[in-house]
Swiss-Prot record:
Protein's organism: Danio rerio
Main location: cytoplasm
Name this protein carries in UniProt: Inhibitor of nuclear factor kappa-B kinase subunit alpha
Keywords carried by this UniProt record: ATP-binding, Cytoplasm, Kinase, Nucleotide-binding, Nucleus, Phosphoprotein, Serine/threonine-protein kinase, Transferase
A single GO BP: negative regulation of apoptotic process
Subunit structure: Directly interacts with ikbkg/nemo.
Domain of life: Eukaryota
Length: 758
């Protein structure tokens, strides 16, 4: 915490000064926190004695700022009454919302960002700062001093939001005060401001374009090592589409219309972003931005910016090669169309493409390709879809290695070559970026392996569901078969007992024996032990895969090497600031050592990762191969179940048919006994019985004449009553389905229990 300047109190009522946030051309900015509410505000005090013109502009600027309400412009707040006395002069204080994540310069200064921000961060900057600039211009405000130091970051609902600060109202842009007003910020000023010409909103286009370029590549576009007075004379004759100028070893300036490598941008974004920069970095202020669009009345550069931000881009990581492919989606494009484009670029046939989201969910062919893009999420580093080749269970390569920047390749080959520290700073920055990139590549591939594992677990869940279904149906079939076999054996036994004196049917008996044999054959269908063993073995494999150390991230060594490279880079930056000439040159042996170790370590962890991934894919393929077997088994079980039920129903019908015959016979006997007549069949039956009776012992012979007739009538009446009762019960149960009926009455014990009634 820095000591407050003279006349400034650290405590103002309930407000306590915590630290100095920054210093500008006109004042200091301090952080104050309310001890009662914990609210934080940034307070800016004007520290210079200004002339009357600038005093008026300072005061007017504060009033204007209080009227601005936009997410991407810092919000002005009322100054607490307790702080009114801390002003260093008679000028009002400016209180603003406090943005806790620092400024854009702080983000760009991180060693891992020395070759540019991540694509998602670049797109977020384009969206936020572009929106803020347009809002200011719509309110007739030109910022004139856009630079990374004047873009602050605030976290809102878990998302980083960029906000424009220091709107520059107190800056007098006449030639005499230019140097005092813009100390340290001239690199971002539009060329016309150096020439004292009149200016328009296009000065903000130039500053914004310069910031975009630096965020993409890590350095400013035009001779970034030179002062503006030096580079403006060399750059003024650049081509209308040139967006970069560098000086070669011979001192010759070379221009380019493209963004340099290394950067972190996808191929799909690179070209439209270069087009945007070509509009914003035109030297001619009249041509800059390309005028207003006739339809939207927006500057053409912001129309193009909106088009870039509205692009739906699918980023695909090909796990067979480690290469990232980006595809710009057309409106309502289907997944089939996207897969055809993937096939053309990766040579993986459409039917063999397995597109997995981070959660392991497969892309749905019935849904549009936009399912591969998350709403509100931009950049290939934020969300990516993983592509697997279903025809392979082992990935052997070749894996696409990250491109080594030319300058880094030079120091790897010429390790001991002494180079100027200023040159080494740029080269080592690219080396740090390369090492960070190797670690990020591994992290993405590990996420791909994790997606494959989650997909395997989803398949395993389905396998378990199928297994449980198969087991349930198998047990049901076994139960029905046991009942059917027990029933038919009992029926055959009882049929044999009564066939000598009751009803007989050779056709029915043959059908019963055939059904018994078929039921015995179905017992084999119900046996699923072999499949159960395969499934249990697969479950064990998957558990072992989950327990494997290779199922967890193995990038610890790479993280340590990255930190070592960053530390070497920081040490080099410190040397660059030392005036001692003996520190003016150095070799790259230490940095090259870290590069080589990182590459070797990445090779090792990738070998382990792909070995583990191959096991995951093999287990998944085993599950896929099992599904048809299980489905066929389920079909066979269902067919057997249906057949057994049909056989049982057929036997039920036969029983009812027998019952019908028995009822008809008893009805006929009753009619004969009442009329005194007897059908020929019954007469024949009686004659046969009489013959049999004559051969029986005296104790078993049928009574004669009147006694016999009375006894027969009574017996028939008793049987008729019992049959009538049985038919009545059957009629009442007729509405119930056969399956819902209680079959226990068919068991032997039930029949024995009921036999007294018969």
């Amino acid at each position: 915490m820095e000591k407050p300047p003279f006349r400034q109190n650290q405590v103002c009522g309930s407000w306590v000064m915590k630290e100095r946030l920054g210093t500008g051309g006109f004042g200091h900015v301090y952080l104050y926190q309310n001890q009662e509410t914990s609210e934080k505000i940034a307070v800016k005090l004007c520290r210079l004695e200004l002339n009357s013109k600038n005093k008026d502009r300072w005061s007017r600027g504060i009033q204007i700022m209080k009227k601005l309400k936009h997410l991407n412009v810092v919000t002005a707040k009322d100054v607490p009454e307790e702080m009114m006395h801390i002003a260093l002069n008679d000028l009002p204080l400016l209180a603003m919302e406090y943005c806790s994540k620092g400024d854009l310069r702080k983000l760009l200064s991180k060693p891992e960002n020395c070759c540019g921000l991540k694509e998602s961060e670049v797109l977020s900057l384009l969206n936020d700062v572009g929106s803020g600039i347009q809002y200011l211009h719509e309110n007739k405000i030109i910022h004139r001093d856009l630079k990374p130091e004047n873009i602050v970051l605030q976290e809102i609902n878990g998302k980083l939001v960029h906000k424009i600060i220091d709107l520059g109202y107190a800056k007098d842009l006449d030639q005499g005060s230019l140097c005092t007003s813009f100390v340290g910020t001239l690199q971002y000023l539009a060329p016309e401001l150096f020439e004292g010409k009149s200016y328009t909103v296009t000065v903000d286009f130039w500053s914004f374009g310069t910031m975009i370029f630096e965020c993409c590549c890590g350095f400013r576009p035009f001779l970034h090592n030179l002062q503006p007075v030096q580079w403006t004379s060399k750059v003024r004759n650049k081509g209308p589409k040139d967006i970069m100028a560098v000086e070669d070893m011979n001192g010759e300036v070379r221009f380019s219309t493209h963004l340099p490598y290394p950067n972190n941008l996808s191929r799909t974004l690179l070209e439209p972003l270069e087009g945007l920069l070509q509009l914003m970095l035109k030297w001619d202020p009249v041509q800059r931005g390309l005028g207003l669009n006739t339809d939207s009345k927006q500057p053409q550069c912001f129309v193009l910016l909106d088009q870039i931000l509205s692009m739906k881009v699918v980023h695909i990581l090909n796990m067979t090669t480690t290469q990232v492919h980006s595809f710009l989606l057309s409106p309502d494009e289907g997944l089939h169309s996207l897969q055809q484009r993937i096939e053309n670029e990766t040579k993986i046939e459409l039917l063999n493409q397995d597109l997995l989201q981070e959660t392991g969910v497969m892309s749905d062919p019935r849904k549009p390709a936009a399912q591969c893009v998350l709403d509100g999420v931009r950049g290939w580093d934020s969300y990516i879809v993983y592509l697997f080749d279903k025809s392979l269970t082992k990935y052997m390569g070749p894996l696409t290695a990250r491109t080594l920047p030319e300058s880094v390749n030079f120091i790897v080959r010429e390790t001991k070559t002494q180079l100027p520290l200023s040159t080494l700073k740029k080269v080592w920055g690219e080396a740090v970026s390369y090492i960070c990139g190797l670690r990020e590549d591994y992290s993405r591939l590990f996420q791909g392996q994790r997606a494959a594992m989650l997909s395997l677990l989803r398949f395993n869940t389905n396998l378990t569901r199928y297994k449980n279904m198969m087991f349930s149906f198998s047990q049901q079939l076994k139960a029905k078969l046991d009942f059917f076999k027990t029933s038919i054996q009992y029926d055959l036994e009882k049929y044999s007992d009564q066939m000598q004196y009751g009803i007989s049917s050779e056709k029915m008996l043959k059908a019963w024996h055939e059904n018994e044999e078929r039921a015995a054959a179905f017992a084999q269908v119900a046996e699923i032990g072999h499949l159960d063993e395969e499934i249990m073995a697969l479950h064990s494999e998957i558990v072992e895969l989950q327990r494997s150390p290779y199922a967890r991230r193995q990038g610890d060594v790479m993280e340590q090497l990255q930190e070592k490279a960053i530390e070497l880079y920081k040490q080099l930056k410190a040397k660059c600031k030392m005036p001692d000439p003996q520190h003016g040159y150095s070799d790259s042996s230490e940095m090259v050592k870290v590069i080589v170790q990182t590459v070797q370590n990445q090779d090792r962890v990738l070998r382990d990762l792909y070995a583990h991934l191959s096991k995951i894919l093999l287990s998944k393929q085993k599950i896929i191969d099992l599904f048809p077997k299980i489905e066929r088994t389920l079909e066979c079980i269902k067919e057997a179940d249906t057949t057994v039920m049909q056989m049982q129903i057929k036997r039920q019908r036969e029983f009812w048919h027998l019952l019908k015959i028995a009822c008809a016979q008893n009805t006929t006997r009753s009619s004969v006994s009442q009329s005194g007549e007897m059908p020929s069949s019954l007469s024949t039956w009686n004659q046969t019985q009489a013959q049999c009776s004559s051969r029986l012992p005296m104790s078993l012979q049928v009574p004669h004449e009147g006694d016999s007739v009375n006894h027969l009538l009574e017996e028939n009446q008793r049987y008729l009553t019992q049959l009538t009762s049985l038919l009545q019960e059957t009629t009442e149960e007729k509405s119930e389905s056969i399956m819902a009926q209680d079959w226990s009455w068919t068991k032997y014990e039930s029949l024995v229990a009921k036999s007294p009634r018969l």
